[in-house]
Amino acid sequence: IADDPAWEQAILDRVKRMVARDKNRFCIIFWSMGNESAYGCNFEKALAWTKKYDPSRITQYESARYRNYDVTYDYSNLDLYSRMYPALSEIEEYLEKDGSKPFLLVEYCHSMGNGPGDLEDYFQIIQKDARMCGGFVWEWCDHAVAHGLAENGKTKYYYGGDHGETIHDGNFCMDGLVYPDRTPHTGLLEYKNVYRPVRVVSYDEKTGRLVLHNYMDFDDISDYADILYEITVDGLCVQKGVLDEVSIAPHSDGVMTLKLDIPQSGKVYLKLRYQLKKELPLLPAKHELGFDEVLLANVDGRNQTAVKWLAEAEEKNEISVSETDTEITLKASDFTYAISKKTGLFTKLQYAGRDYLNHPMELNIWRAPTDNDMYIRAKWENAHFHEAYTRAYKVETIQNQYGVIVMSHVGVVAPTVQKILDVELVWKVESSGRITASMEVSKDAEFPELPRFGVRVFFNKNLSEASYYGMGPQESYRDKHRAASHGLYRSAVKDLHEDYIMPQENGSHFDCDYVELYNGRYGIAAVSETPFSFQASNYTQEMLAQAKHNYELEESDSTVLCIDYALNGIGSNSCGPEVLAAYRFDEKEFQFGFTLVPYVKG
C-alpha cells in the first residue's frame, strides 16, 4: 500500500485531514505520517505536501526504514531518523556510520509487567550525543476492563481472551507505567529517578568538593531546586542538612563544597534529595524531584549489623550427629537439624523447640517468568530450568571442636538434559545453631543464562515480618534499582509483593547485606559477607507462573525466602531488545555463601 500509486489519494487525504485538524494546536511539535505502515512513493508525496503546507514543524516517520531495498527513495522531507526499541548497539552504529538526522526513540523501554530494566542505559546514550532527541516510553497505563471484585477483595481486571474472544493479544495491552487504576508501577518510580533534573558527577571525601550537573534545558538550578543531604550509617541517619544555594546553568556542571565528618566504621552513604523550591501549577513546593546516593570510603566499610550477625558465638556446646541411609541429624541443646542425603540440603530446622521449616530447602535456578522474559522463557523451558531439582552424589560429615561440617557434591539437574550445575556445597553448623553455607558452582556452558541462582527456603508462615539492609523500599534488580536506595527497611512480608495484574517474578531486593524474618517471639537472619538479593513472599514461583490474574492467587502455607547470588536482568524484551550483556546472569563459575542465624527474642 505504501508504494502502490492506487493508494496515493487515500494516504494523502488522511495526512491532509490530520494536519488541517491539528494545525492550530500549539502542543503539536511535529507531524508523523503514521505507524508501522512501511514506506514508499505515497509517503514521499505525503511528506512533501506536509513540508510545503507547514514548514514550521518537523516531520518523522519510523516506518521509513521498512522499504523495498531495490528502490532508492526520497527522504529529504524527513527531519528525524526514528526507531522503535532499538538495541543500544544499533543506536551507536547509526551515530557512528550515518548520523545525518537526529535520532528519535519513537518508542522505547516497553513497560510491561516487571520492568523496564534498561532506562538508565538509554538515558546515558541519549545524554552522550547531541544528535539524540530522547524518546517516548511505551506506554503510560495498563489497559484492562474492571469486572467488579473477587472474593478476596481484589479488582478483577480482564485483558485479551478473558471475554471469550478468539483473536486477541492476551495481556499485551498491560504494558504501562501505571496500573489500570493509575497507581504507579515500580517502573514509573524508576523512570522518575533516572530522569531526575540534577545528578552528582563526583564527590571527594577529603576535600568536600561536590560536582553537580544540571540537566534542565532552561532553568538554573538555583531557581527551581533545594538540595537536602543526609548521612546514613548502616541505614541510620546520623547527620542531615540543606546545601547552600548554588547557581548552575542549564546543561552545565557546578562545584560546591560539602565537608563531612565521615564515620570510620559501617556502610556510609551520602544521599542528596532534590526538592522543588516553589509551588508549580501541578506540584507542591518541596515535591521530591529525585535523589542521588554516594558510597563514602572509610576505614571499615562493612555493615556493622551484618558483622555482628556473622560473629561466631563464644559458647561451644557439643553437637551429636546421627545418620541413617537417607538423613543426617544434628542435635545440640538448642536445636535439631536434619540434612537429606538425597539433596545435601536441610529438611528440618528446629530451634528452641520451634519448627522453622515447612518444606525441604532447595537450590533454585527458576523464577516465575516476567512479561519481559517472554522470549528467553522458551530457551529456559527448552533447557528444563523450570523442572530443575537438586541431587546429591556424595555427602560427608566432619565433626570438630568448632561444630559439624557437612560437605556435599551436588548437581542441579532436570529431566532429559545433561547436568545444569555442579555444586560443591559445604554447611558449617555451630553449636549455637548458626549455619554457614559455602558453594562453588560450575555451569555447563551449553545452557543459556540462568534465571537466578540461590537457595529457596520455605519458612513457617508465622515469620511474617521482614527487616533488611539493602536496596528498597520497592523491588530492585541488577538493571532496575535507580529508584531504590540503600537503607534499613522493615515491612510485613505480604507488603513486599508487587501485585502485577499478570502474576510474575516480583519483589526481589538487590545489593543486600542481611535480611531478617521474625514475629513477636522468634526469628532468623540470612547474612552474607558479599551483597546478595533476596525475595520474601507468601507465594511460590510456581503459583505466580500458573496464575493468569492476580485475583486468582491464594497464599501458600509458607513464608518463602529466596536467598540469591544473582538474578538475570529484567530488561524490556517484551517488545524491546534482549537484556544487555552486562545484566545477563551467564557466569560459568562462581562462589556464593551466606549464614543463617536463628534466634529467640528475650
Predicted regions located by residue number:
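Residue-level signal for short segments within beta-strands and strand-turn junctions
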Residues: E139, I231-V233, L276, F459, ...
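Extended substrate-binding grooves/exosites of carbohydrate-active enzymes
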Residues: I1-V211, Y215-D223, L228-C237
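Short acidic/polar inter-strand loop motif in beta-rich domains
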Residues: Y274-L283
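Intrinsically disordered, low-complexity Pro/Gly/Ser/Thr-rich segments with frequent PxxP/GP/PP motifs
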Residues: A225, E230, G235-S265, Y274-Q275
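Extracellular and select intracellular beta-sandwich modules with Ser/Thr-enriched
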Residues: K240, H287-D292
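Short, glycine-/Ser/Thr-/acidic-enriched flexible segments
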Residues: Y66, P86-L88, C109-S111, D142, ...
